[in-house]
């Protein structure tokens, strides 16, 4: 990338980096660390035309979420404004956008792909 004087780095984090989760302090810390790492590198490499961003998925239909208890899964979905779990394509489409020329002026950012869950998260705990 340095040799080519351009490039894109896209790191994958998690909604848990922003919200925390019971029993997942280590996971939340590691994902939050990726965000700080990415922002620091984005500042360092911006003038070298290397863009560094994060994608922060929420609950996406995967083998991992298939193992979630159905009652808990219904509760999670009720907290997502879009009313559904995301698909892998939702995340990959965001990554494709960040890898494309359409995102040349975007660096040091985290894009949330979670059906609005992060946006609405705090208000659910108040109600």
Task: Mark where each language-model region is.
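C-terminal helical subdomain
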Residues: 54, 77-102, 106, 115
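Short C-terminal tail/terminal secondary-structure segment
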Residues: 19, 96, 107-127
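Residue(s) in the substrate-gating loop at a strand-loop-helix junction
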Residues: 14
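Alpha-helical segment proximal to the catalytic Tyr-Lys
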Residues: 43-47, 104
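Active-site helix of classical SDR
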Residues: 30, 38
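Short, flexible catalytic-loop segment of classical short-chain dehydrogenase/reductase
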Residues: 18, 35, 53-67
């Amino acid at each position: 990338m340095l040799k080519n004087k351009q490039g894109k780095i896209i790191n994958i984090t998690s909604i848990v980096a922003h919200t925390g989760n019971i029993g997942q302090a280590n996971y939340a810390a590691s994902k939050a660390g990726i965000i700080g790492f990415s922002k620091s590198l984005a500042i360092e490499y911006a003038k070298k035309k290397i863009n560094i961003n994060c994608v922060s998925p929420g609950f996406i239909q995967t083998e991992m979420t298939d193992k979630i208890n159905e009652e808990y899964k219904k509760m999670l979905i009720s907290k997502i404004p879009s009313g559904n779990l995301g698909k892998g394509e939702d995340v990959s489409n965001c990554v494709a956008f960040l890898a494309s020329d359409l995102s040349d002026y975007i660096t040091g950012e985290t894009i949330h792909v979670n059906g609005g869950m992060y946006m609405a998260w705090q208000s659910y705990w108040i109600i």
